[in-house]
C-alpha cells in the first residue's frame, strides 16, 4: 500500500481498519450489486439504484485520486455501513 499522498491517507487508513477487521467489499457493476461482508456478521447487500450510487461514488473517488486503487476506495466508502453491525 502506498500512502505517499497526504490527501488520500484517510482512505488508506479506513481501508486498513476494514481489512484488519476481516471486512470485504464485493462490487459488480454489471449486475448492480454490492456486498459488504465480515466474519460473524450478516452481509450488507445492496442492489439496483443503491448499489449503482455506491459504485459511482467509489469511481468518483478513484478518478479524483488516481493513485488510490479501486479496492481501497470501495473499502473506505463501505466503512460507514459497518455501523449497522454495532
Which residues does each PLM region occupy?
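Short acidic DE-rich linear segments
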Residues: 83-86
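Negatively charged, low-complexity tracts enriched in Asp/Glu with abundant Ser/Thr
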Residues: 1-22, 61-79
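Acidic, low-complexity, intrinsically disordered interaction modules
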Residues: 26-74
Amino acid at each position: 500500500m502506498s500512502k505517499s499522498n497526504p490527501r488520500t491517507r484517510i482512505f488508506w487508513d479506513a481501508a486498513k481498519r476494514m481489512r484488519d477487521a476481516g471486512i470485504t467489499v464485493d462490487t459488480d457493476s454489471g449486475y448492480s450489486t454490492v456486498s459488504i461482508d465480515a466474519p460473524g456478521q450478516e452481509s450488507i447487500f445492496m442492489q439496483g439504484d443503491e448499489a449503482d450510487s455506491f459504485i459511482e461514488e467509489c469511481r468518483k473517488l478513484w478518478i479524483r485520486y488516481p493513485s488510490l486503487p479501486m479496492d481501497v476506495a470501495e473499502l473506505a466508502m463501505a466503512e460507514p455501513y459497518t455501523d449497522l453491525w454495532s
